[in-house]
């Protein structure tokens, strides 16, 4: 898999290594009985040897002529012994870096590696991915040649159908691919080619969700001026068909926003009408459409075998619309069964499936035979939906006003009772203070009376003594 930049360490001059590689190719081609590569390049290598010995500036055009012959014959490397394939390709990659434009040779090498390695049927894909990864990592991050190498890696993974190899590539697709696309400065056609290659590999590896993502990204590369072309139509039909049949795709906004998909309104009107039904309509409209227009007759029968999948998805979308539009936030089982055309005993199954799809949230009440809606996804948001939101906001406002009124009443009652309690406490405190004052006065009065009584008694006692 692509990793940090790698450097190949191979000793020898260009002429020496080219001659050695030519001999190796001749050994692999000996059964063909053709002219040897070494004999063809020897006249071209002689002046290069002289330049290397005199430390003169090498003739790049001369090197390119040598490389053309070597690369043209290099397809035979796929027949090399398993233990020699990687080292042989590494030597060829090293030689290609001497070219004036390595890209014109690397794209051809990638095409060789995308073909089966006949000498190792079991490990051929792993060997090819290893070699391509080495090539990728020897190139600078901004080198546009990486584009062709990356396409080669993706092609090998797609052809092998290896889930393990694709899973190893996925982190790079998420973390690095956007940066690579920017640094490689691809045009719309190249970007579309890359996204479609990734989509094909994801589909082969059993990842339809990632495949759908890259199909949409490929669709977005189509310029508005080319939206009505045959290529754009084919891609739009593929993207639309994939989205309609994918069990986890319920948002069709990216499709309706595409110029290429909008162009289907003229070229494939029935398919576009079906998209509009899935975007905003219900099961009733879908069944009426299918009755009038059999799926087998839409755009060459691309949806001929998708009847059950489309109907099931339409049921989920219909339930989402019901949940979003009900003002009471409560859906009786009978209403759901009638709208989805299912038996009453299957209602809970369809509600659970819709919850799993992320379209609604809520609680099933078996006792009351109803679905209590907590959240519902709006499939489209227009004037009707704004009116529903306004109505619900008014209901919430009235509810909040009632709550606020209750809170105010309770607050006033609390304040009133608090004041009354404080006043009662103050009166009680004053009463206790008065009682203490009265008791203290009585004690002082009794003490004074006792003293006066004693004073009156003393003269009498003195008189008696006299």
Swiss-Prot record:
Gene Ontology cellular component annotations, sorted alphabetically: eukaryotic 43S preinitiation complex; eukaryotic 48S preinitiation complex; eukaryotic translation initiation factor 3 complex, eIF3m
Residue ranges with Basic and acidic residues bias: 433-443
GO molecular function: translation initiation factor activity
Residue ranges occupied by any PCI domain in the UniProt entry: 211-378
Region (Disordered): 40-62, 424-466
Keyword match Disulfide bond: no
Keywords, comma-separated and alphabetical: Cytoplasm, Initiation factor, Protein biosynthesis
InterPro entries: COPS7/eIF3m (IPR045237), eIF3m (IPR027528), eIF3m_C_helix (IPR040750), PCI_dom (IPR000717)
Domain of life: Eukaryota
Compositionally biased tracts (Low complexity): 451-460
Presence of the UniProt keyword Ligase in the record: no
Gene Ontology BP terms: formation of cytoplasmic translation initiation complex
Localization terms from the record: Cytoplasm
Role: Component of the eukaryotic translation initiation factor 3 (eIF-3) complex, which is involved in protein synthesis of a specialized repertoire of mRNAs and, together with other initiation factors, stimulates binding of mRNA and methionyl-tRNAi to the 40S ribosome. The eIF-3 complex specifically targets and initiates translation of a subset of mRNAs involved in cell proliferation.
Subunit structure: Component of the eukaryotic translation initiation factor 3 (eIF-3) complex.
Membership in a protein family: Belongs to the eIF-3 subunit M family.
Name used for this protein in its record: Eukaryotic translation initiation factor 3 subunit M
Gene source species: Aspergillus oryzae (strain ATCC 42149 / RIB 40) (Yellow koji mold)
